[in-house]
Amino acid sequence: MSAEKKHDYHLVDPSPWPIYVSFSCLVLAIGTIFYMHNDVSWGMYLGLALVLYGAYMWFRDVVIEAEHQGHHTPVVQIHHRYGMTLFIASEVMFFVAWFWAYFDISLFPNEFVGNVWPPKDIETFDPWDIPLINTLVLLLSGTTVTWAHHSLIESDRKGFIQGLTLTVILGFFFTLLQAYEYHHATFDYSGHIYGAVFYMATGFHGFHVIIGTIFLAVCLARAKKGHFTKDHHFGFEAAAWYWHFVDVVWLFLFAAIYVWGS
């Protein structure tokens, strides 16, 4: 009786994955730096593989705790929501830094960019071509993920799965269009401030889209296994929050960099 749980909190068991993922991120960061400076890519790909494996194992344990061990009580879910809110807030500040850098150099161009913005040797993208299509794709994906959420709340499992499926497809389509745009760009990320800021801002957003697509794909796989109910679905709710955040960031990127900046 002394070991009986008398509270609603989850005292997590020791896990190797936090420290493993931390070191994997270090390998990924160092590998990326070497790739940018020396065009040596194996370290970056090794770090990425290590991070993906660690994330898979870590989230697998979290799913087991939630679905099979019953550790995610209503009190625990409240704190999960607090945590996700703080995480998204930190991501907002991350993008604020890149918007700040962009507007600082574009509103006050110096001699390094020829005192004009965009620089004269830069051929900007037509905002009403692929960028507009990507905007419509993400707006539509925001609608489909909301449809999935409402279907789950109404216990419509079929609508939930259909909405998630469409959202994942749209996220993948956005990434393909972004890759196509990068491939046909007339400038790269090195050599001038325009390319650096453009690729860091839109590239990190693209990375977030990939992460969000994987997040939602995992939710889709879990949904097909019968996971998530209208009263217990924070895993999907967190993915939906993250996806809406990605949508909003893209609207600002589209307006600031593609439309105004062109």
Model-predicted segments: where are they?
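...captures the hydrophobic TM-helix bundle architecture rather than a specific catalytic motif
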Residues: 1-262
